[in-house]
Amino acid sequence: MARRTWAEGLTERCELIHKDIQERNERTDIINRAISVALENLKTHVGTLEHRFTEAQTWANDLLKEQHVALDGWERTFATLGNIPARKDFPFLGRPSTPTKGSDNSTGTLRDYLDTDEVHRAGSEAVDVSSRFARQVEDVEKAVGGIAADTQHLVDAAVPAGVDGVEGLLQEVETISRKIQSDYEHVLALPNNQKTLANISRLALSHTKDLLPSLLEVSAEIQTNLEEAARQYNAAVKAAFNHMRQISLIESRLADVQSQINNLNFQSDAFDVLYTVFHMPFVYGSILIESVRRREFSDKMKSDSLTLAEEMSVFQDEEQRRRKKWIKNMGDFVSMSDTTTPGIEVNLRGQEYEWPVVSRKEIEAYIEELKTKPGMASPVQELTQLYKELDAPTRLQRRRAKAFKQGSVFDLSRSSLLLRSDDMVRSLRDEKSKLEEKVKGSESRIRKLEDLLHRQSHMGRPASGNFSIDFPSSPASPHPDTLSRRSSVSSRRMSSNQSSEEKALVQRIVHLEAELAAERETVQKLQKDAHAERQSNTDKIQEVQSTKNDLIGNLEARQREFDDERRFLEGEMKKCRIRAEELEEELDRIMESREHEKQDADERIHQLELELQDAHARAEEEIQKATDLTAYTQTLKDAEESLRIRIEELEKQESERRERERESNQALQAAFMNLSPGGSVPVDTPSIVKAIEVLSEGLSIHAKNAEESSAKAVAESKELGERLSQLESEAEELRKTSEMRASELSLVKEELAQEKTRLENVASDLDDERSKFIALQSKLASGETGSDALQERVIEEERKLADLSQRLNEVEAQARKAEGEVLVWKERVEAMAETEQHAAGRVETCGTRSQELSKQLFRQVEKVEHMLEQLGFTVVRQNGDIVVQRSSKVTALSSTAESLSQSGVVSVRPDPTLLDWMHADTSQEETDRFMAFMESLYQFDVDIFSDAIVKRVKDIEVLARKWQKEARGYRDKYHRTQSEAHDKIAYRSFKEGDLALFLPTRNQAIRSWAAFNVGAPHYFLREQDVHKLHTRDWLLARITKIEERVVDLSKSMNGANPDRRSIGEASDGTSFDDENPFELSDGLRWYLLDAMEEKPGAPATPGLGKSTVAPAHVDARGSIRLKRTSAGGNVARTLSKSLDSRRNSSNSKKGPATPSQRGNDSTTDLARQADADSTTATAGSQPREAAPTSEEVRRDQLQGP
């Protein structure tokens, strides 16, 4: 009873602890979710900031690059402006602040239109402005990087999670408690006897040894989980506090950085002045061109107005004479006064400011002057384009030049006004040149297509359709006079839809202007909304900041409450630990008192329990094995079914894939031939695709490698030259230093010899004094009476001895120092000699490498030019520039003498004699040779080569996509037509799988059956027993096999066995193994068909079959007998010629088609059907006299249905 009550109480306490743990885990999860939401919001703001900063940084980097370019080159450009001559009669040119210099000279330089002081002042100010702007951008970048790093650190920081696994512990406690409760109820139900008492004792011992300790351990673990949950909750609160504080700091920094990015702007008048320096050449040239344009327009207006006035005056005079003549004739009947004929008066209005007179030669001279200046390539190109536009006709003139193009007489009359003859001639000449270029391109394409058609006719049938139906039928080379006449006629026409198109364009412009105004209003409205939203966001941020402060205060209060609760729980925990220790001691005493009595019973129970567990484990293993086997069997069945379905799908996909491969193979072969005209086409499709990819990649990589190699070679050659000069200067300095050190070494050696001499003298003096000193000491020791003088002498001698010893030490120290210096100088001289040798070796190595690099560059240029020639390009020099063109265009350009004088095919290969530039005798000669070598390399522009290659590859890609699209269209058309024609009766171009109607021929002797046809005779049926043709009038069957045969009567005459029979031989005696089973003429091609009946059960009695055959009887009238003519020799000559033509034809030489060829030929049936239709129509339109002669019409042509 006590155990049950104790277990129930412990279970209730564990449940309370479990609820407390769940509450703490929920609070921890709530805090973690709140932190996650705050971090996600921060990440969103930081991501927006980084995006905005990336855009601002891109803009700032581009601006800084432009500024650096302007700062690096404005002085050079400004100096160049001083060398470019310019006129001074353009007072409106220049900045408003530019002072006007009074000078009598009419010409000056472009620098006169600029203020020199202002330009220099702007150049000095621009450096500071650019550096200040760069520092501002760097500060913003550092701030954004710091914010992103702090945000990432917050995101990566680990957040404490709740405690898991408490549910299992609580379930274990409940299980043990229920076990104790059930055992208690079981004991109460047992009878009171000796056996029952023994069982009860064993049960109580089991509880004491197993259940109660397990229950205590689980309850202690639950208590530990409660403590862990409390610690994690406190840690989550602290982490949330730190995270929120850091998030608030980061957001405040983020707002500052956003304001800095918004204020990141650049406005400077200094750079505007510098940009004016760069733009001045183009602006001045544009003004010159505009002056010429305005002057020519004024002259044209004056001349056209005079011409118009003259023409109208002529019309007025003619009308006046006609009226006088009419009144003279009708004067007796009409009473009216002679009035003057109305006329017009042409006046020019709106005379503008008179611009200075500028001629075209001045513009050309100015452009040529700019070409000689460095860094003026871009203005020269733009000015050249503007100068070319002077001769370009206006839009109205281009329209009037085409007056007769789908126009009317009104258009012609309207275009005849205000259009000078020179303008008309120039427009017509331009149109003619364009049309000639177009015709030449068309002729080239036609020749290529004809060549492709010719090759297709001699090759095997293509795998993906017949492309011959797409070839144009225009002649390969039209007559030039006719073409010129057509182009001149078409150039005088005008489109009748031009006015409607202009109206539509005007309406479109008005509509677009209205949309533009609406969009501007919308933008203004959005700007206002954005400003209001920005203000509201600022207010919201302030509210959020105050809310954060309140939350922080609440968190601090909760933190104090949690500390008080933690201290209370720690006291309770100590009490529980003391109580648990007391209970453990009591249990130990009880267990020790009963341990000796129940030891044997425990061992037997333990053995039985082990056996029971083993039996349960084996049973569970057998059940699991059976379940796994059943599941594995079902899985195998499902897998087999899925594999079967998958195999069917894969077979369908394989058939479709093969069809697609056959269709795309021809397009890929054509693309490969265009990309590599001289190469051999691979057999399979992956090889073709890989070859095309390799060729295109090789072209691009080759271009890129050539460009990189040339750039590296130039840079390395410059670096090697600089290094070589530096090494030569270092070697010269080392020679001078070594000579100076040698002289110093000789001086030091002389001083050392002198010091050694002095040292020897001092040593001899020292020995003398020592001997004297020893003698004195001996005298003193022997007892001689010394006097004061003797003592003073002794003292003096001792002093001299000390001085000499000191001098000796100093001299020895100086000698050692001198010897050390001598050794140091020797080492320096040796090091300098080694350095000089190393420098000489480096110079020689650099020379060798420079020569190898030059040779490599030479080979690269040769390879690039050879590759251009292989691709069909030719390098042409025009106006001193290198242009890469197609060979056909070069031929067209060289057709006239003018183009021959201006352009010619040149070679960009460097001179091989320049490769030895590093072996010059003098440095000046080496510099000249190197510059000549670099100029020869600069003649080949890698950018032009890359553009040509890229354009060529893109053209090939466009052509491949076009052909692929056409192939898909033909494939769809073929599938659609095939599906439509599958259930229809074919009557021409028979192939395997077609449904054909077979009818008996009129040849009753051999009883032959032929397919009903239109323009496709000689398709005979191989009779089989299943057909039962003797009981039928017609047979509807599907063709399964086609055998192509040619009649050769020579074999039958030479002894071939005519009595051979086929397996499916008909009962009427027809042998299909004979050369001529149907008695056809010699050399005739015929076909033997195997067919299976499509709809069994054809009517055997006369019925609809007679109506079907009746037209055949009517249409097949003719005489089997040959019509004799008087000219027998002509007949024999005609027959032999026909026979030779049949035998020598390409179709007769072909053998029977294989099944694969028949399958491939199925894609060409549409083309053959169209050809057959056209042939039939042509033959039907001809008179009967044009039909074949009677000698060629034999019985084989009359035995059809």
Swiss-Prot record:
Keywords tagged on the record: Autophagy, Coiled coil, Membrane, Protein transport, Transport
Region called Disordered, residue ranges: 90-109, 458-503, 525-545, 1052-1076, 1115-1201
SUPFAM superfamilies associated with the record: Tropomyosin
Pfam families: ATG11, ATG17_like
Self-association state and partner proteins as the record states: Homodimer and potential homooligomers.
Family named by the database record: Belongs to the ATG11 family.
Protein name per its UniProtKB record: Autophagy-related protein 11
Organism the protein comes from: Aspergillus oryzae (strain ATCC 42149 / RIB 40)
Name of the encoding gene: atg11
